[in-house]
Amino acid sequence: MPAAPHPVEIWTLTLCNLGRRPRRLSVFALAELSLLTDVSLYGHASYLHGIKLARSHGVAARKVGMNLPNPYYSAIFLSSRRPTSWEANLNAFKGQFRTLANPIALARGRCCGGISSRDPVGAVLHFQLRLAPGASPRTDFLVGAADVFKVEAEASRYVRNYLQSGSLADDHFARMRGTDEVDVLRRGRWERQ
């Protein structure tokens, strides 16, 4: 995305059903919002917590420590689509003795909706999608910095500016959107799509 007036990055996920039958997909999007810096901060985890941003379809990590010189000690992960379930606690998403390669939320088929306090913040948004034949739904994701004391307000502004139809981002995306190709197993053969 070209330089914008806000500290954000936008990703687009488009899934296409090229088959003849309707499909159901369970999609998990994850952004680890650690808020770590080069500066050694004593008690980093003590000041860190993750919250749900219900109106903005996302999760935020907030770090409210003593005498913080930088108001942008908050990070957000938003979606243009309402998630089916969500999680703000990376450890709850992974599960005990598990890793990101085999998280418990994937085995359960949904997130628990937990907040995070003194645990790593993993902004996880889960979507149950139904794709009709030929359908290709698009979901935009935004990762950005926000003022720690105005997280909800800034998340709402980011949604208006970048994730809603007709937003600033739509014009930029129309000019620069590219398509990644992946290999798909179809009728026993790998095909590039």
Model regions: which residues?
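Glycine-centered flexibility motif
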Residues: 95, 99, 113, 119-120, ...
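Beta-strand-rich interaction surfaces with strong enrichment in secreted/lumenal proteins
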Residues: 1, 112-116, 126-131
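Residue-level preference for beta-strand/loop junctions
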Residues: 7, 121-123, 135
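Short beta-strand and strand-turn-strand segments in soluble, beta-rich domains
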Residues: 40-46, 115-125
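Polysaccharide-binding surfaces and accessory modules of carbohydrate-active proteins
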Residues: 1-108, 155-184
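Short Pro-Gly-centered flexible turn/kink motifs
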Residues: 23, 129-147
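Short, Lys/Arg- and Gly-enriched loop/turn segments at beta-strand edges
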Residues: 145-155
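Substrate-binding groove/exosite segments of carbohydrate-active enzymes
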Residues: 118-121, 181-193
